[in-house]
Amino acid sequence: MDAVDSTRAFVKGVKRVIIKVGTAVVTRADGRLALGRLGALCEQIHELNSQGFEVILVTSGAVGVGRQRLRYRKLVNSSFADLQKPQIELDGKACAAVGQNGLLALYDTLFSQLDVTSAQLLVTDNDFRDPEFRKQLTETVESLLNLKVIPIFNENDAVSTRKAPYEDASGIFWDNDSLAALLALELKADLLVLLSDVEGLYSGPPSDPQSKLIHTYIKEMFEGLITFGDKSRVGRGGMTAKVKAAVYAAHAGIPVVITSGYATNNIIKVLQGERIGTLFHRDAQKWAPVGDVGARDMAVAARESSRRLQAMSPQDRSKILLDVADALEANEKLIRIENEADLAAAQQAGYEKSLISRLALKSGKISSLAKSIRVLANMEEPIGHVLKRTEITDGLVLEKTSSPLGVLLIIFESRPDALVQIASLAIRSGNGLVLKGGKEAKRSNAILHKVITSAIPENVGPRLIGLVTSREEIPDLLKLDDVIDLVIPRGSNKLVSQIKESTKIPVLGHADGICHVYVDKSANMDMAKKVVLDAKTDYPAACNAMETLLVHKDLVQNGCLDELIVELQIKGVVIHGGPRASSLLHIPEARSLHHEYSSLACTIEIVDDVYAAIDHIHRHGSAHTDSIITEDHEVAEIFLRQVDSSSVLHNASTRFSDGARFGLGAEVGISTSRIHARGPVGVEGLLTTRWIARGSGQVVDGDKGIVYTHKDLTSHA
């Protein structure tokens, strides 16, 4: 998720950037300065300044700050009788004069904390009528930028001669948005960023769920179609003013991005090429609009198709899965060809062996996937299952039944087999599905998606399962909390963390797979060797592979640990040690005890007893899967009861923590969450519940005449 968006590739050539921050961002709803937002703004400018960018700031807010201060001053100097009189609106010029001092003093304080120097430049509309002024202004700004000083511009409203409506034909600029656009031209900026109190330009009011964020503004496409709301609650501008300024600058060849000033890192993201906010660019009409038909339409289509799927009989839903399994086997040769093309590209690109291993659809994999789908098809019908049946009162019966969640968004990295498992689970559970796989498996995912959706009957439709092919659509999808019901990320810690930080939609999954095997002093060592080797070497890249081997201290003294290490090394496993093991065994110390290798490597640490092992797991584990090898059943029960992980095993490999091996048919992922599903997530984890009541005219009427029986009828369901 960190590649530059194709429409934002121009940012690589940006050096001089003008940032305009409006009053709605500078101040809070009560008129006071928004210190948190201003602090975040200054930190971003400092970071850009240190990276060699030339940053110019255009700020609003002086009038608002001054008004708040003067109102307070007037209040403390007023008698009770004065307060009863009609209040006269404060003069805006006086507010500007008072507020300018306080606003710039705050900027100076914040920048000083970051060892950044700032300079104040107040301008008026009339100043720009003088060519000599423009020349001197440019020279001054150039000097400041060469000294790494941040020029801070604001219109000098205290002495401005212009009056409302501020848009007469004689004006050179009318607000700080148009001032920023004018400065972008005068100072030859490479980019103009206009910070707003919303995420960008929407097709309608941002509060309307049907309004879409426009990522790239194309005048010919959107002019006349966009509905603007009110102007800014505190300033002279608003979105209309920002769009006019952006169109003006973009027409002159300066790209403009309108984005939210409320987010703490948006300016950095814009300059990293992320597709946030709305871009105005002179060449925008030449670009194919990216994602304009994508995100919401795909999710809505998946929901509509899922409702048709739910309306089918259980037998018909099962038949779809059987048809999918047959289609996979019938197209195995074509699937393997596309997968081999992905593998060749990954090897040529120099990807890590662990990623290439996850990417490969090895011999027999398609048959194995088809078999698991058939098992899933023949499982008990999961939808509409009556979990509880209660008689509320005579003639009124309430049922708690299983029900699909709705629409799932699954984001996964390099495992194309995950697409098959997830799609089959979605069909079985009656859910709509939107998939986004890793770019390294692009061809494999495309052919698998085509084969699977081709097997879905027309009365449900292939749009039951959508496949996102562009990274740029992910941020849009993550905002659709009114359409998408659950996000399940499958991949690296970085991927899962990014998803959790970027959405309001519930997220199910795990960030790490730090799985432990603890070999107790009473372990059968032949069994221990077999289990440890399987847990580490059967599939080192899997999230349920052993990453840390814990051994009882007695196994050091009797030489059993040495035997385990030799067996691991014979299999090519690179050994790292915890602090204790590293010191005693003279092996390289692990960089962290919370580390997922996803390769033929592991950490070994020595512990005093089962309680120390449990403590280590709780401190350094990820609540995924942990196993104990012991012949002492009392010790085993302590471990099984006290280790707080989603799957805990006794005398068995961590590799058993898998949906298919647990008999779930397949899994959509493994969850370490404590809410909803936990552990391998199969069909049941993709269901919720709802209540269905069947009555015969009952009314509450203040509970008069109602005799509540609350009789449990579950056994009769």
UniProtKB/Swiss-Prot annotation:
Where does the record place the region Gamma-glutamyl phosphate reductase?
297-717
Coiled-coil residues: none
Positions contributing to ATP binding: S196, D197, R236, G237, G238, M239, T240, A241, K242
Q: Does the keyword Plastid apply?
A: no
EC assignment: 2.7.2.11, 1.2.1.41
Question: Per the UniProt entry, what is one GO biological process?
Answer: L-proline biosynthetic process
Write out the similarity annotation: In the N-terminal section; belongs to the glutamate 5-kinase family.
- This protein is called Delta-1-pyrroline-5-carboxylate synthase
Q: Which organism is it from?
A: Actinidia deliciosa
Lineage of source species: Eukaryota, Viridiplantae, Streptophyta, Embryophyta, Tracheophyta
